[in-house]
C-alpha cells in the first residue's frame, strides 16, 4: 500500500475522514429514515423499501471496495532508469559490477530533454524521468502519468489506479442518482402522509436529498471533465498547462534515421493538448482504461499489470514495461517535418544510437 509522506499538509488526512463520515451518515439516513421509516412504515411499501435498501447498501459496499483498491494499488512507480548512453561509457566491467545495475541505458527514439539534448533527471529518485512522468511530493517518488492528488480520497491518482478512480466516480454518480430519483419520486406521498399524521417531515430525508443533489453536481461535473480529458489523451496536470493558463514549451530529442542524428525540437504552447492524441477518442480511452472494453465497467484490479525488470536491463522500453509512453503519430510527424524544415534548436550524435539494429 502506498503511503503519503508526513510533509503533506496535516489537514489532507481530515478530508477523507470527513467524506467517510458523510457517506456513513447518508447510508444510515437513507436506509433507516427514508426506506424503513417512511417507505416501509408510513407508506406500507415493504417490497420497495427492501429493494432500495439492498441496492443502496450494495453500491455503498462497492464504493468502499473501489476506494480501498485505489489506495492499495497506488498510482504506480516508475522503475529507476539509468542515464542514457549519450557519451561513450567510461566505466569498465568491474565498476559496473560494483554498481550492481546498468550504468547507462540505450536511448529511445524520442525523449524529453533540455535545449542541449540532455534528458530530464530526477535528483530525488536518481533516475531519468520517462515521458509524462512527474515526481510526487506526497509519495516521494516518480509516478508514471501522474494525474493529481485527490484530497477527497487521500491518495495520488496515476497510471495504475486511474481506471479505478474513474470507476469510483461512475459508481458514486449512480449512487447519488438512485437516492435522488427514489426520494423525489416519493416525496409528495411522504409529505402528504406526514400532514395526515400531523407530524413534520423527517429532516434526515431532506438532508440526504440535498447531499445527493450536491454529489450529482460536483461529481457529475468532475466525471464529465475526466471523460473529456481521456478523449483528448490528457491528464489533469497537462490540462493545467494550457496556453491561456500557464503556457510552456517542452523540448524533445528526436532520432532521425535518415542521417542518424538526433534533433532537439521545441513544442509550441498550443500543442500541449494534442501531442499524446492517438488519433481517435476510442483509441485514447483504450490508452487510459485498457483494451478490454468490458473491464472498463468492472471495478476490479488495474489495467496495468505487475512487472519486474532486471537491474542490468539496458533497454529503455523493457525497463518501463507497461509504463512506456509514446507521442501520438500525428505529432511525431509534425516534429519530423520541423526537422526537415530546419526548425530545430540543435542536433547531436548520441553514442547509444550506434547499437541500434542495422547500424
From Swiss-Prot:
This is Palmitoyltransferase PFA5. The lineage of its organism: Eukaryota, Fungi, Dikarya, Ascomycota, Saccharomycotina. GO terms for biological process: protein targeting to membrane. Coiled coil: none annotated. It is an enzyme of class 2 (transferase). GO terms for cellular component: endoplasmic reticulum; Golgi apparatus; membrane. The keyword Acyltransferase applies. PROSITE patterns: DHHC. Keywords: Acyltransferase, Lipoprotein, Membrane, Palmitate, Transferase, Transmembrane, Transmembrane helix. The gene is PFA5. The keyword Membrane applies. Its EC number is 2.3.1.225. It catalyses: L-cysteinyl-[protein] + hexadecanoyl-CoA = S-hexadecanoyl-L-cysteinyl-[protein] + CoA. It is a multi-pass membrane protein. It comes from Eremothecium gossypii (strain ATCC 10895 / CBS 109.51 / FGSC 9923 / NRRL Y-1056) (Yeast). One of its GO terms (molecular function) is protein-cysteine S-palmitoyltransferase activity. InterPro entries: Palmitoyltrfase_DHHC, PFA4/ZDH16/20/ERF2-like.
